[in-house]
Amino acid sequence: MSRVGKYPVALPQGVSITVVDGILTAKGKLGELKMPLSERVETVVEDGKVTVSPRDKEAASRMMWGTTRANVANMVQGVSQGYAKTLEINGTGFRAAVQGSNLVMNLGFSHDVVYPVPQGIKITCEKPTSIKVEGIDKRLVGQVCAELRAFRPPEPYKGKGVKFEGEAIRRKEGKKK
């Protein structure tokens, strides 16, 4: 029995979900998301709730049960409230700015790092050392943040680099004489 999959997903006001030809579509005030459904699970929309159940007792079907339910819940929250993550930049001279549809970062390299902002993502820089990534697709917001962090991950000696807000960096002591 899936402890995640057995709970129905409640639909907030203004969110509608339709299932057509194995594709689940969620529409809300912030936009629309689509997701192909696995043939191993059955998805039913009724009474303002989405219920996911496995089609058989196989292990793969039970795995997809909880995964599908979690993905549907993420889509519902995305089209109703959206997702946002904040990155912090630490380091002397390290900064970021949005120029047109690109994010330009100075991260201590001999060149600027230019990151084209993907469709469906909004990036803002309130301060030169802070990057806010917003969107309706939780997976895409997390992926963009991971790609930005990968340009210069925080190093353990001084903590310089790009990190998530609130992320604890494991620090090391420098060498001793």
From Swiss-Prot:
Quaternary structure (record): Part of the 50S ribosomal subunit.
Family per similarity comment: Belongs to the universal ribosomal protein uL6 family.
Keywords, comma-separated and alphabetical: Ribonucleoprotein, Ribosomal protein, RNA-binding, rRNA-binding
GO BP, sorted A to Z: cytoplasmic translation
Name of this chain's protein: Large ribosomal subunit protein uL6
Alphabetized InterPro entries for the sequence: Ribosomal_uL6-like, Ribosomal_uL6-like_a/b-dom_sf, Ribosomal_uL6_a/b-dom, Ribosomal_uL6_bac-type, Ribosomal_uL6_CS
Source organism superkingdom: Bacteria
A GO term from the CC aspect: cytosolic large ribosomal subunit
PANTHER family in the record: 60S/50S RIBOSOMAL PROTEIN L6/L9, LARGE RIBOSOMAL SUBUNIT PROTEIN UL6M
Keyword Metal-binding in annotation: no
